[in-house]
């Protein structure tokens, strides 16, 4: 029998390739790995898109057209980034559903770190959604950020602060782009914490069988 705890204390990188779990888990446990693949794809494609993107209300839409038409393989990067975002959320909701079904929420540290990840991911997705700054994204930014005005006393002040003025304008797009660029690095950090916390104890045992048979 392998003593995983001793091995984990030998080198911190062992946390990423040694998970004390037997063959009694199902295919539903693949979605965590798929999420890491999505995160890697989004980070790489997002970096190349950011190189050519212009965070200006007069040039943002034109820069997207420039990326898809003029930049070599830019259309692949743009489409992969857009479709990858949808795949990201499909995987994460399946990942959450599996956790709810099999009672993974009982592992509180892992579950709370995952919940934090979801909140940061949703914020990142929203900031990214408005970046093309076409008619739809401009409207979405106005409608969704206006929800802050529902907060008693502080609503109007918070909305004005987020917009960078009395209406959505160039400062809004600039800060949305800055936030969309920096938040993925926070997601990567939180993902590392999530993985370390998970590998510290191992996965749950949905079938209730002996996990030492391997």
Curated annotation (Swiss-Prot):
GO terms for cellular component: mitochondrial inner membrane. Heme b b566 binds at residues 95, 194. It is found in: Mitochondrion inner membrane. Heme b b562 binds at residues 81, 180. The cytochrome bc1 complex contains 3 respiratory subunits (MT-CYB, CYC1 and UQCRFS1), 2 core proteins (UQCRC1 and UQCRC2) and probably 6 low-molecular weight proteins. Component of the ubiquinol-cytochrome c reductase complex (complex III or cytochrome b-c1 complex) that is part of the mitochondrial respiratory chain. The b-c1 complex mediates electron transfer from ubiquinol to cytochrome c. Contributes to the generation of a proton gradient across the mitochondrial membrane that is then used for ATP synthesis. This is Cytochrome b. It comes from Cerastes cerastes (Horned desert viper). The gene is MT-CYB.
């Amino acid at each position: 029998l392998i003593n995983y705890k001793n091995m984990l204390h030998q080198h911190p990188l062992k946390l990423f390739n040694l998970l004390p779990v037997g063959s009694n888990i199902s295919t539903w446990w693949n979605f965590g790995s798929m999420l890491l693949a999505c995160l890697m794809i989004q980070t790489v494609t997002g970096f190349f898109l950011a190189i050519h993107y212009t965070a200006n209300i007069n040039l943002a839409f034109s820069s997207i057209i420039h990326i898809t038409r003029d930049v070599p393989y830019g259309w692949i990067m743009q489409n992969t980034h857009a479709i990858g975002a949808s795949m990201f959320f499909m995987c994460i909701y399946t990942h959450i559903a599996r956790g709810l079904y099999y009672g993974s929420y009982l592992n509180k540290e892992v579950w709370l770190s995952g919940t934090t990840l979801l909140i940061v991911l949703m914020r990142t997705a929203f900031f990214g959604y408005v970046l093309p700054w076409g008619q739809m994204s401009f409207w979405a930014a106005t409608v969704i950020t206006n929800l802050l005005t529902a907060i008693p006393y502080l609503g109007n002040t918070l909305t004005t602060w987020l917009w960078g003025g009395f209406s959505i304008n160039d400062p809004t797009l600039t800060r949305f782009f800055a936030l969309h660029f920096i938040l993925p690095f926070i997601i990567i950090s939180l993902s590392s914490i999530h993985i370390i916390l998970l590998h510290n104890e191992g996965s749950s045992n949905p079938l209730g069988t002996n996990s030492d048979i391997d």
